[in-house]
């Protein structure tokens, strides 16, 4: 059970602070008082050195990818400030609240990364008997693919299913959609809200199995005196970005939990709706799964 945030620009570097403003970044970070089981980020940027430069080792990359994952709560980790100030072309941020008693280990921290893709997920993937998908006797994914994610959780299994679809030659957005369809056969009422980042695209999906927050999540939020924040727990909203001239400059999307005023351009995704954005042009579109 996590809080997700991601953005894609029109090919230039912007920091999270530049996109949201310091107050909103602070309120997002403050969610880690509850979502305190670690955090992580995946950042895409344009390297200073020319692409494909032969420098004695592997040729220099066209896109630089950096990952950070920690078992510390974001509010207690000074690295969060540094990363939130880092100008990048695209980014994912993840605040974790561990589900189904899955262990608080670095392997289960998100984003996961494999085959050039970063992945974050909000939801507990369990069947109607309450059994987490990683405990079921028959795995829906190949073990080798599952291990390639580096994780051991239900979220890692979701990512592995996406990777298998991509390996069959299916485009990224359709791979995410097909992975959800396959997993819903086993765990129909689970949440598959997620974000995936490649060197070219940001995929944001709202795919909740039901509208109500899980009773465990409600209990935890009430314990922290923030029960009012749990009402729209499964909502993901997005806002188009503009540059200083008012021209389109990309898109930002995030889970609820901090102010996302519709008067400021925030729009909730419908359930089973996906946003597909380019982190090179900033253009984005919506589709149903």
Annotate each predicted stretch with a short phrase.
Residues 1-119, 125-289:
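N-terminal segments that mediate ammonia production and transfer
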């Amino acid at each position: 059970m996590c809080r997700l945030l991601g953005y894609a620009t029109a090919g230039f570097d912007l920091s999270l602070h530049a996109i949201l403003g310091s107050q909103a970044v602070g309120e997002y970070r403050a969610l880690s008082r509850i979502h305190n089981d670690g955090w992580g980020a995946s950042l895409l940027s344009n390297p200073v050195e020319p692409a494909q430069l032969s420098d004695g080792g592997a040729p220099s990359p066209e896109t630089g990818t950096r990952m950070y994952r920690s078992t510390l709560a974001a509010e207690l980790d000074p690295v969060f400030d540094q990363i939130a100030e880092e100008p990048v072309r695209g980014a994912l941020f993840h605040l974790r609240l561990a589900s189904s008693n899955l262990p608080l280990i670095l392997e289960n921290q998100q984003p996961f990364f494999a085959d050039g893709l970063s992945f974050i997920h909000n939801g507990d993937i369990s069947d109607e008997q309450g059994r987490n998908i990683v405990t079921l006797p028959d795995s829906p994914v190949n073990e080798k693919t599952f291990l390639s994610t580096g994780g051991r959780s239900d979220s890692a299994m979701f990512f592995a299913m996406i990777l298998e679809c991509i390996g069959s030659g299916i485009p990224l957005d359709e791979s995410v959609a097909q992975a959800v369809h396959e997993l819903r056969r086993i765990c129909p009422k689970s949440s598959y809200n997620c974000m995936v980042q490649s060197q070219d695209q940001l995929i944001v999906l709202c795919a909740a199995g039901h509208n109500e927050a899980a009773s465990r999540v409600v209990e935890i939020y009430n314990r922290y005196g923030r029960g009012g924040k749990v009402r729209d727990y499964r909502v993901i909203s997005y806002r188009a970005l503009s540059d200083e001239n008012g021209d389109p400059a990309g898109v930002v999307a995030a889970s609820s939990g901090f102010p996302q005023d519709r008067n400021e351009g925030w729009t909730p995704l419908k359930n089973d709706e996906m946003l597909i954005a380019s982190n090179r042009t900033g253009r984005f579109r919506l589709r149903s799964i």
